[in-house]
């Protein structure tokens, strides 16, 4: 049987319908991949999860660029948010810090010579050497402040700078992948004010004090500045940040940070336990299994 050719108008309508259907299916599949989540909704959920965080346990793998080379560490962390209490174990080294105790110092078992417990300032040279951060920045509130500052910087351009890239499996768990970009990342001149240090400057600008130290070769330490000095500071915390956000906990479990030189730092969280109450003895030096 010989088929009659389709009328041009019918053919045009058929093609148009197929194109529209194809476009609709593509959009639905893309939306379903992130459960119709927008970047703005995702960030609100992340901030809510952080603000409702009471306790957390996790294993942390950390890579930080120190003097041009990536330095790797692994640690086990127990953290209570309020009042802030922290226990940290790194290859035989133990750190215990509890808010309002020990004159603000951390109790440290060095696990080696001098084989005695030490009381150390978390911001001091012994605890801070070759580290991007101190124990004071552990947890998520520091990261939350940096992200919120990034939102203030981009204003109504959130969809250009904060991009939800879909979902990705991480350590067997489903995560949202979020890209935060500042393509205009640059270095600016900053005049040091009275009583400022690199740490107070970094907190004010929501940038990394280690990055400032690394890029001002004349400075030896974080307090090596005085009023009137002119230093270089970054325009934002990063040029690119890639976050994997656990779909259940709504907390970042992977954080990769890039600056104008490349990879700056990565933090990867494993075996997280969120809001599981602690036995308060776990924040005492005599707790079973500790070696203080």
Residue ranges of predicted features:
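N-terminal leader/targeting segments and the immediate start of mature chains
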Residues: 23-72, 82-84, 155-161, 166-169, ...
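N-terminal secretory signal peptides that target proteins for export/translocation
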Residues: 1-6
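Amphipathic hydrophobic-ligand
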Residues: 69-76, 263
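Extended lipid/amphipathic-ligand handling interfaces
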Residues: 45, 75-81, 99, 241-243
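Flexible, processing/modification-adjacent segments and terminal tails
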Residues: 31-42, 52-54, 62, 70, ...
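Gly/Pro-enriched, hydrophobic low-complexity segments
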Residues: 91-96, 136, 144-292
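Bacterial N-terminal signal peptides
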Residues: 10-21
């Amino acid at each position: 049987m010989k088929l009659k050719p389709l009328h041009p108008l019918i053919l045009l309508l058929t093609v148009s319908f197929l194109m529209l259907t194809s476009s609709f299916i593509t959009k639905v599949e893309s939306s379903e991949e992130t459960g119709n989540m927008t970047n703005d909704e995702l960030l609100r959920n992340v901030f809510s999860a952080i603000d409702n965080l009471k306790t957390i346990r996790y294993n942390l793998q950390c890579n930080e660029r120190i003097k041009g080379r990536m330095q790797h560490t692994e640690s086990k962390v127990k953290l209570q948010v309020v009042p802030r209490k922290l226990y940290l174990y790194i290859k035989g080294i133990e750190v215990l810090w509890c808010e309002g105790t020990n004159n603000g110092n951390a109790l440290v078992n060095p696990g080696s010579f001098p084989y005695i417990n030490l009381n150390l300032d978390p911001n001091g040279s012994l605890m801070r050497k070759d580290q991007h951060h101190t124990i004071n920045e552990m947890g998520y509130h520091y990261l939350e402040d940096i992200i919120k500052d990034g939102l203030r910087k981009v204003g109504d351009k959130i969809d250009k700078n904060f991009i939800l890239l879909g979902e990705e499996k991480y350590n067997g768990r489903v995560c949202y992948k979020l890209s935060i970009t500042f393509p205009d990342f640059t270095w600016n001149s900053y005049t040091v004010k009275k009583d400022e240090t690199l740490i107070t400057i970094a907190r004010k600008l929501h940038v990394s004090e280690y990055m400032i130290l690394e890029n001002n070769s004349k400075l030896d330490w974080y307090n090596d500045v005085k009023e009137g000095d002119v230093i270089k500071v970054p325009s934002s915390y990063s040029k690119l940040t890639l976050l994997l956000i656990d779909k259940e906990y709504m907390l970042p479990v992977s954080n990769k940070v890039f600056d104008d030189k490349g990879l700056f730092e990565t933090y990867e969280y494993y075996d997280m336990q969120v809001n599981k109450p602690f036995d308060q003895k776990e924040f005492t030096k005599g707790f079973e299994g500790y070696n203080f």
